Amino acid sequence: LFFIDLDRFKEVNDRFGHDAGDALLKCIAERLRRSSCGADRLYRVGGDEFTLLMPGATEKSARLMAERLMGVMQSPIKIEQVSIDFVGLSIGIALYPEQAEDAADLLRAADQAKQRRGRARLYTP
């Protein structure tokens, strides 16, 4: 499970308005969806947070996916006439059943792992 948080998203709403923030969320969601594989499931948790469920992920495949996901923010996103290049991602990763016994533990572990801005980290107990 990947827990994805948008860094500096509030700044988009504050500077350009909530319509721009909504448009940015849609664009980022589409980029994340395109970067994932067919069996993966992307969900918006709320606000500026997403989860990506990657069935059968290993530590190696999760790290490779995290690199791919971090890459979605390499190019600026154009909203109306504004180019937004300062929003980034923080990603926490937790593997089931290695790092959690149930869905709540898995989400908690991934959330705990994502606490470093601009990084993708695998949960370590």
Task: Show where each model-derived region lies.
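A short pre-motif secondary-structure segment
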Residues: 41-44, 85
